[in-house]
Design a protein with these regions (language model features):
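Histidine/cysteine-enriched polar flanking segments
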Residues: 1-210
Length: 210
């Protein structure tokens, strides 16, 4: 399995990740705000067998993105969308996938994501929060944790099991508080403890207090 992470990820966290994953660190995107310019969920988006990124970012990170596509067997889609230093112009790729749903702020979401959602039969759930993926810890198909009430209201109405927690307790320099989605990764452990199925697992980045 591969793990895609910030180029600034601390050495001790990388050491832990490398016990389970092949780690690929993405280079920074200076078109994004400095506190988040290494955050992969603002630079790339995966849906099924497709990976979407911007032309301009691909010119910076082609080696890493090509490696991701090769290792994961993904087809690359390049978007000509622009990105900006201020919200909501920085969150075009920050959509969350849960089951056959794409949770996002539709007006801020990259048009290639919306096009692909339509072509592949995904339902787009429109929420007020542009940093949707940052705001959601994806537990499994159809289950999330979030501190965002606007997201929780929409996901609950659409049959997604949602745990609403209090905001805060996660640090993100430059912002009032961090987001649970940005502090976690979601993956599957295959055939763990002789159980013949895929089990959801969560890796928490440093300590999480709810």
């Amino acid at each position: 399995m591969i793990c895609i992470c910030d180029y600034r990820t601390p050495a001790d966290v990388l050491h832990t990740l490398k016990n389970e994953f092949e780690v690929i660190q993405l280079p920074l995107d200076a078109a994004l705000p400095a506190p988040v310019w290494g955050h992969s969920d603002l630079m790339i988006f995966r849906l099924d067998e497709y990976l979407i990124t911007r032309y301009k970012y691909y010119s910076i990170a082609s080696r890493e993105i090509n490696l991701i596509c090769k290792k994961a067997g993904l087809k690359l889609i390049l978007s000509d969308s622009a990105v900006g230093l201020k919200y909501p112009n920085d969150c075009g790729f920050c959509a969350a996938v849960s089951g056959k749903n794409i949770i996002c702020r539709r007006s801020s979401t990259d048009r290639e994501i919306l096009r692909l959602a339509c072509e592949t039969g995904y339902k787009v759930l429109n929420v007020p929060q542009g940093y949707t993926k940052c705001s959601c810890a994806i537990l499994a198909d159809g289950a999330i944790i979030t501190a965002d009430r606007g997201i929780a209201s929409v996901t609950l109405k659409n049959g997604i099991d949602t745990l609403l927690i209090s905001e805060g307790h996660i640090d993100l320099p430059g912002y009032s508080y961090g987001f649970i989605g940005g502090a976690t990764i979601h993956f599957h452990i295959i055939k763990l403890a002789a159980i013949n199925s895929s089990l959801p697992a969560i890796f928490f980045y440093f300590n999480l207090f709810i």
